[in-house]
Design a protein with these regions (language model features):
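Conserved catalytic core of the tyrosine transesterase superfamily
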Residues: 1-302
Length: 302
């Protein structure tokens, strides 16, 4: 089974899955493999062919004893993707997950950053230093575009189209996204004042090098974002998607509809934006504009 997992993860790389997603799928499958091999026998392709729906339900029950439902569903999604890979390559005829319905999860509301908090966060880096200017450019990009961390670190310098204020976000959801004037100005400074001479290899196309001169890591960016959130005095529950949620919610409160968010995020289905459907509810808007010290100057219907 080890060989099959390696082949599967190689295919995910070919399909341009984010490295973080590839590693999560790999770890999920290794846990499933350990469960299959709990009697000490190595799991083989024949063992996978012999699996039935009840085996998957038994494994699901074992996961549910120690994990939240969201994590259980992620494990099952990894299995579904793996067995689909085996089917596509003619290694099995049917998947034991065919027709299996995952329990629905009611999404919680994302942490809401106020515009003033975002401004404080973005302005926290000391851009008189090259690292601070790089960090300011990354934060401006995250808020200007709503891109994910893994999309940010995969950017190359050539993905910026500053003359037309656009950035090309590559990957499975490749798209062109507009940039704010503020982001364009900071990125121009970064490209001329900070990036030159900071690459370990001058021909490296990466937009944001880390301290070692090679492409900065996802964890490296996340640590920086948390550091600047703390420096900005933000005490809220902060996670890698908080800036993305702020981008979406502020646009919706400004009047953009969910179909616009769908295009900016590269979603294929409008249902993927359901997390933000509450934002235009009258009660939510009224509370937001009533209690937000800056937005309170505007009308809830503005």
């Amino acid at each position: 089974m080890n060989r099959l997992i390696l082949q599967f993860t190689a295919q995910l790389h070919i399909d341009q899955y984010a490295e973080n997603s590839v590693q999560n799928h790999r770890l999920d499958l290794q846990q499933f493999q350990a469960w299959l091999e709990r009697d000490g026998q190595l799991a083989t392709l024949d063992d996978l062919k012999a699996l039935a729906r009840q085996d998957i339900l038994d494994y699901q029950g074992q996961l549910a004893q120690r994990l939240k439902q969201r994590s259980v569903n992620r494990h099952l999604s990894s299995l579904r993707l793996f067995f689909r890979f085996l089917q596509t390559n003619g290694l099995i005829e049917a998947s034991p997950l065919d027709g299996l319905v995952f329990p629905k999860i009611i999404p919680g509301l994302p942490t809401l950053l106020l515009p003033a908090e975002v401004a404080a966060l973005v302005e926290a880096p000391q851009d008189s230093h090259y690292l601070g200017l790089r960090d300011r450019a990354m934060l401006e990009l995250l808020y200007s575009t709503g891109m994910k961390l893994h999309e940010l670190i995969r950017l190359d310098a050539e993905d910026l189209q500053l003359d037309t204020a656009l950035v090309r976000i590559r990957g499975r959801r490749e798209r062109l996204v507009p940039l704010t004037d503020k982001a364009v100005a900071v990125l121009r400074r970064y490209l001329t004042e900070a990036r030159p001479g900071r690459l370990l290899h001058p021909e490296d196309p990466c937009l944001f090098p880390g301290r070692g001169g090679t492409r900065i890591s996802r964890m490296g960016v996340w640590k920086l974002v948390k550091k600047y959130a703390q420096a900005a005095g933000i005490q809220k529950n902060f996670n890698p998607r908080t800036m993305r949620h702020a981008f979406a919610i502020h646009l919706i409160l400004g009047g953009m509809d969910l179909s616009g968010i769908k295009l900016l995020f590269g979603y294929k289905q409008l249902e993927a934006t359901a997390l933000y459907s509450h934002v235009n509810a009258p009660d939510f808007r009224a509370a937001y504009f009533a209690y937000h010290p800056i937005a309170a100057k505007r009308s809830p219907s503005a």
